Amino acid sequence: MSILVVTGTGTGIGKTVVTAALACHARLAGLDVAVCKPIQTGTRDGDDDLAVVARLAGVEDLHSLAKFPEPLAPLAAAHRAGADLPSRAALDDLIAAVDRPGRLTLVEGAGGLLVEIGRGGVTLRDLAEDLRAPVLTVVAPGLGTLNHTVLTLEALAHRDVRSEGLVIGSWPAQPGVAEIDNRDALARLGPVRAALPAGAGTLSGTDFERLSVQAFDEAWVRGLVG
């Protein structure tokens, strides 16, 4: 399987735009690519992450298992909708069914790595462990990011889940001392695969394609496909 799980050090960190950029790069490189977002919340306000991926990346093979209207953590959003979260088996089966030989399957989580997304406390880390998939972590550039990043990487290492590196989800146009120093420090924690500029999600299709091609190393992206 060629599954890459995309998580973040928090909510609103840029996971969806990073997922879209990586999917766009893979598509333009001629790779077969699919995107899964097993759990989505906040859809009542038109916040559909897979629709964002489709618009930005031009990828049509998109999959989700459960959508809840309120912009809350998955468990709270499910309960307020009178529903349960999916089972661990259902989440695993969704992703396994999408993946196939020669395909890059991107799986975007909801919130951070250890947020409950399945019944019984199942997290994105559990799914990565089940599927033997590496994890790409989207991080912030500002103050606090080093602690959050280390906690996420340690949580992965605790379960022997391989880290595929880091992506800075929103790099400011005028970075300050903290951001510049943090970028160097993040690179010591793991390979920084890309740093997407702030506002990347507002770009037009052509501009987003150009950004996606430039943002990631093509050899690394191709190497994700086993």
From Swiss-Prot:
Substrate binds at residue 41. ATP binds at residues 12-17, 49, 108-111, 169-170, 197-199. CDD domains: DTBS (cd03109). The active site is at residue 37. Its cofactor is Mg(2+). Keywords: ATP-binding, Biotin biosynthesis, Cytoplasm, Ligase, Magnesium, Metal-binding, Nucleotide-binding. Coiled coil: none annotated. Its EC number is 6.3.3.3. It is an enzyme of class 6 (ligase). Pathway: Cofactor biosynthesis; biotin biosynthesis; biotin from 7,8-diaminononanoate: step 1/2. It comes from the Bacteria. It is found in: Cytoplasm. One of its GO terms (cellular component) is cytosol. GO terms for biological process: biotin biosynthetic process. Mg(2+) binds at residues 16, 49, 108. It catalyses: (7R,8S)-7,8-diammoniononanoate + CO2 + ATP = (4R,5S)-dethiobiotin + ADP + phosphate + 3 H(+). Pfam families: AAA_26. GO terms for molecular function: ATP binding; dethiobiotin synthase activity; magnesium ion binding. PANTHER family: DETHIOBIOTIN SYNTHETASE. HAMAP family: BioD. Belongs to the dethiobiotin synthetase family. Catalyzes a mechanistically unusual reaction, the ATP-dependent insertion of CO2 between the N7 and N8 nitrogen atoms of 7,8-diaminopelargonic acid (DAPA, also called 7,8-diammoniononanoate) to form a ureido ring. Homodimer. This is ATP-dependent dethiobiotin synthetase BioD. It comes from Mycolicibacterium gilvum (strain PYR-GCK) (Mycobacterium gilvum (strain PYR-GCK)). The lineage of its organism: Bacteria, Bacillati, Actinomycetota, Actinomycetes, Mycobacteriales.
